[in-house]
């Protein structure tokens, strides 16, 4: 590497250039010619004589033409002459613009080298500084390094020379890989020096790294030697001590021997452990035949016996994990897991192939000659063993679900294909939507039944299928495996939920008839129960879709009555007829309600198990379709039709009449369905409210008719006066009449005033009172019972007051009985007879 770094000394330098320093000789370059007397120099190039430097003998002549000679001195002489010739040829004038001094120097150099004769060529004149022309010649020939190599040739043996050439050759071969810039490295200037030094640094660093790498390999050995050296030295000292004992008697309390005995015991324990581990290894391994069954065997009972053995090995090898060293247990369990993973993949592929070929197989024997029942048993056993690998087991269930879902969906959709030749398609008819929905649901039910049979034939595990299963699998998956058929059935049927819902929903959402919608609700509920009996879970999507369709139908039923009230009733703002009968819309509306109630009561038992919110005629819905139309529509409409009812008693009588007629109609239509309204307190309150309103209006009508009757007979003023002091209804005996003695001072109670106010009106109106009340006032009441009740109560009140008022006047004026009988000229019997009261 020194040769590489200082290679610039081999080149010819421009001594006229002042920028670069002149190379300094590092070694003595004095040649043989320099030691001779000055005179004519022999320019024949001569290598330093090794023999002369070693033995002080005379210099031997060298043949310059010995390139092919076997003598090493002749070869080196030839190489040196060749280098000088190359230096001479590679350093001509570099540019035309040089000054005359440089040109002169160049010519002088050329002339000097030309005039040199081989015999006068001396190395000392080429490399040693001298005066005149010899100085430039010496500085331009060889570098200090070449002189060093040549002068020290006697110190370098043949192997070193070979190694030097080999190093240069290696650099030449790897210059591209090392990215060597040849021109820069051969540059004799300072840049070349830096490049060669950098190359040397890189080479030394790389060499140092290689040496460190080699030394790193000795570190473990050194550490092991250091770790064992103390023990070895201790053993050595102990052995020397024992051997030096002349008595050959070993003391019993020798600590060293006790320690050796302990080590011996430990060695025996280790041997025992090794024996146990070897026994365990022999026990927990598969032989070659079993391994071949796992790798190349078919899925049969023999295969499952081997798998069972592998699982038992895994279960029984858990105690190895209790050892201080877990490597054995971990290695065994890892190997067993690899075998189980291989077997599970093989079982998985077998199950997939079996599923694809199960439906298509037409004979009872499969490719392996087993019967169909045996194949099913192997299939179930394969499922049991595969259940230990949840990932593959779930993937199998997904494959089964996907395969069967596509199959049943294609079967379902094919029934709506109008071009189908295999079966009659399901056609939607506008005149019979119930039949269409029934056909759709019947088709789904048939598919569910067939699929349930298929799934149970493959995935319904019995105790016989699980009797030979390893305990570890049964403990983890027995419950899950026994319910896998139901889970698979539900997963497969989910593919029908959306298609079924779409075909039914297009009917439900556009059907307005509440009776048809109610039939749809019944049909959906019926098939929902049938689906659940086939194993479909209550929370599955197809059941949820049927429930949502039921809710839509129920909402359509309730919405129909709400829309009816909005569209029909709101258009009729007042009662157009004078007969004070209920509005026509109320009769029609009640007819529609009765029609719904009748069909609902026939199937009321089907909703007994449903919650209150899911019932069609729940208390909330009953309030919506019964109570709210009466409160929000009917009563407001009647109040609007008779705006003067609060001021005019005639108008009020008409309002009360139509209100009584309306509520009597409502009560009569709802009365047959008391059981429907008796399902809870909220529903019961609706009918109670209707009856209370009817009683309220009847009572108001009674009060109003009594008032009219007393006004027509002239007794209204005295009725108010008498009742103000003491109610007439409370008079029981003669003593009660004393309560009215204060009336004697009232001018209205004078007999002449009574005659004036009562006698004429009473005698005029009383004969026609019964006809007037029945014919004119109560004729417009549609209920004869209510009319008779009001009529009877009015005349009873009138008869009672007339009788008490007559007795009161006699009590007040006992001396004027004849005058009293004259004014109130009807006896009690006559009065009652005229007003139609029977005793």
UniProtKB/Swiss-Prot annotation:
It comes from the Eukaryota. InterPro entries: COG6, COG6_C, COG6_N. It is a peripheral membrane protein. Pfam families: COG6_C (PF20653), COG6_N (PF06419). GO terms for biological process: cytoplasm to vacuole targeting by the Cvt pathway; intra-Golgi vesicle-mediated transport; retrograde transport, vesicle recycling within Golgi. Keywords: Golgi apparatus, Membrane, Protein transport, Transport. It is found in: Golgi apparatus membrane. GO terms for cellular component: Golgi membrane; Golgi transport complex. Residues 14-38 are annotated as: Disordered. Acts as a component of the peripheral membrane COG complex that is involved in intra-Golgi protein trafficking. COG is located at the cis-Golgi, and regulates tethering of retrograde intra-Golgi vesicles and possibly a number of other membrane trafficking events. Belongs to the COG6 family. Present with 1720 molecules/cell in log phase SD medium. Component of the conserved oligomeric Golgi (COG or Sec34/Sec35) complex which consists of eight different proteins COG1-COG8. This is Conserved oligomeric Golgi complex subunit 6. The gene is COG6.
